[in-house]
Curated annotation (Swiss-Prot):
Top-level taxonomy: Eukaryota, Metazoa, Ecdysozoa, Arthropoda, Hexapoda
PROSITE patterns (UniProt xref): HTH_OST
Record's subunit section: Interacts with smaug (smg).
Name listed for the protein in its UniProt record: Maternal effect protein oskar
Chain ranges of the HTH OST-type domain: 174-243
Organism encoding this protein: Drosophila virilis
Length: 594
């Protein structure tokens, strides 16, 4: 968007040099005219001590009137003889101005020198008032394009171009808080600015009343201090506000916020990406030389009822594109030909046996029919294969279970954050037939105490390094910090008793609790406790990779909104693809085998 901004306050710099020269001449003439009127008014108010002084004063006034007429004639020569061809759209205003100027000269010529001295003061005061009113009328006609507002004490050499706000005194008297309300609207939209129509709409939502002005809204907005205007290529005027000392912190906070994606239809925003099923089609071993797409026949069976996990997923209305993959295994076919499927599933899970079995097969069409009856989820990648394509992450699982959350040989222990990290990046699968999503030692809504109870039942080799990231659920439930720290110490002690090696990680920032200072302080203090508790252990600082150098949370590493989880009543704002990759990279950089 091509924009331009005036070097003066609140006025777009869009006029050529000829118009600028004319404006300067008009401004100088009006200043001289007004100063002469003020001097004349001050002289009329001085006490008249002697008649000679009154006569001398009348002569002096007569000379001042002559000088004023000369100044007016000089102004007339400047104004009438000026080349106004560039002001084609202002012809109506120029005509009105000439009529006012002619009426003013006729009024000056109608004065008689024989008027009594006692009658001169009200007449002169009335004339001065009329001339002041004429100046205000002319200023309102030319608005922000020709006339600049100058106070009586302003310097003649001043050239600041602003708009006279005397016209909108009535509006501000009727709506005393309108300037503050408009400034708050502009400050809330400081990232990209806001148009007049949007200002009207937000003003109605904020106050419950319609915007009081219908004409000259641009001029009115520019009378508000620190308001600026820009113009884009399409011609729309974009308004914004400059920060002050009191609002600079709010202005910087708004500029650092994530920009919302403009979606015209909220229903379309919840739809999955187009042709998303094609990304998760059945994986066929690449060792076969035949094409299953030409010979595969769909099974002639009805789809079974949804499992409890699928039912819970179907009832949820919130859909996030980067978490859509977990629905891949929700809709399953009944287990037909169980012995055959089990045999082929066992062969497919062991690539060495699969390669040994291939030379002995002589009827590929038979295998095509058998693989056509395999369930959909049996073709998806399991932890025994590469977790991601070569373009993503290259970690490999060495665990035989299809459900445990592992990073290489390191089991993960945590709540929803590690659970979805394992599902989305490491391709671990949720345990079937469970209402609460879980994978290995990662369970949705798991607290520290629940993790300690579950750790007693797990069977793992001694000296197994377990990556621990837990405590967010306890903090979101509002538990006291000392109780959380006590449970965490018991968890570490239980791992030592089982001869496991804990790899501690700090808690990530809770994106949906950043407004709560008490919660943020509790997260910071708990992370400090983890570093102190793990001074003799390995501690991975996940929190540092999700904040910038100024300590501000990287909201571009989080999803756009909170999401309800199956194991907790508290919603979570999960990490998006960027955040998960940053966390995974941080963990792998600090891992090593003993």
């Amino acid at each position: 968007m091509a924009t331009f901004r005036s070097e003066f306050n609140s006025v777009p710099n869009t006029y050529n040099q000829r118009l600028t020269a004319l404006k300067k001449k008009l401004t100088t003439c009006f200043q001289q005219w007004r100063q002469q009127l003020l001097k004349l008014h001050q002289q009329q108010q001085q006490p008249k001590q002697q008649q000679q002084q009154q006569q001398h004063q009348s002569q002096h006034q007569h000379q001042q009137q002559k000088q004023k007429q000369r100044g007016s004639e000089h102004f007339y020569n400047i104004f009438v003889r000026a080349d106004c061809s560039i002001l084609s759209e202002k012809v109506t205003y120029l005509r009105k101005f000439k009529r006012i100027f002619t009426a003013r000269q006729n009024l000056a010529s109608a004065r008689t020198a024989a008027t009594a001295a006692s009658a001169k003061q009200p007449v002169l005061g009335r004339c001065i008032g009329q001339e002041e009113q004429q100046l205000q009328i002319v200023a309102s006609l030319f608005s922000s394009t020709l006339i600049s507002k100058h106070s009586s004490s302003a310097s003649i050499t001043s050239s600041s171009m602003t708009i006279m706000d005397n016209t909108y005194i009535g509006v501000r008297d009727e709506y005393p808080d309108i300037d503050t309300e408009i400034r708050s609207i502009l400050l809330a939209n400081a990232q990209n600015g806001i148009t007049i129509s949007s200002i009207k709409k937000e003003y109605r939502q904020l106050t419950g009343t319609a915007f009081p002005l219908h004409d000259n809204i641009t001029d009115f907005l520019l009378t508000i201090p620190h308001v600026t205007a820009e113009c884009c290529e399409s011609g729309k005027r974009i308004f914004n506000i400059k920060p002050t000392e009191h609002t600079r912190h709010l202005h910087e906070m708004i500029l650092q916020q994530r920009q919302r994606d403009s979606v015209s239809n909220p229903i379309q925003a919840q739809e999955p990406p187009r042709l998303w099923r094609a990304q998760y089609k059945r994986r066929i071993p690449q060792h076969f030389n035949f094409n299953l797409n030409t010979s595969e026949k769909p099974p002639a069976v009805k789809i079974s009822k949804l499992q409890p996990l699928a039912t819970a997923a179907a009832m949820s209305n919130d859909v996030y594109q980067d978490n859509w993959k977990h629905l891949n295994n929700q809709y399953q076919l009944p287990q037909l030909n169980a012995p055959k499927n089990n045999i082929h599933s066992h062969i497919a899970s062991n690539p060495a046996q699969l390669q040994a079995a291939l030379p002995a097969e002589h009827h590929p069409s038979k295998h095509v029919e058998e693989y056509a009856h395999k369930r959909r989820h049996e073709y998806t990648r399991t932890p025994t294969t590469l977790s991601c394509p070569s373009t993503q992450h290259d970690s490999m699982f060495t665990i035989n279970s299809d459900y445990d959350a592992y990073l290489l040989d390191f089991p993960l222990l945590g709540d929803d954050f590690f659970l979805y990290l394992a599902r989305m990046e490491l391709k671990c699968r949720f345990k079937k037939f469970e209402k609460v999503l879980q994978s290995g030692l990662c369970i949705s809504g798991q607290t520290i105490n629940a993790a300690r109870q579950r750790l007693r039942l797990v069977e793992l080799p001694e000296m197994t390094q377990i990556i621990v990231n837990i405590g967010s659920e306890d903090i979101m439930r509002g538990r006291s910090l000392v109780q959380i720290e006590h449970d965490f110490r018991l968890l570490v002690k239980e791992m030592h008793n089982r001869r496991f090696v804990p790899v501690l990680t700090t808690l990530a920032p809770l994106a949906n609790c950043r407004h709560d200072k008490q919660t943020c302080d509790k997260v910071s203090r708990f992370n400090k406790f983890i570093r102190s508790e793990g001074r003799h252990l390995k501690v991975i600082d996940i929190h540092s990779c999700l904040i910038n150098e100024n300590g501000i949370v990287r909201f571009d590493c989080f999803q756009n909104g909170p999401r309800s989880v199956t194991g907790s009543s508290e919603p979570y704002v999960f990490w998006n693809k960027i955040g998960r990759q940053r966390v995974l990279h941080m963990i792998e950089e600090n891992l090593e085998y003993y």
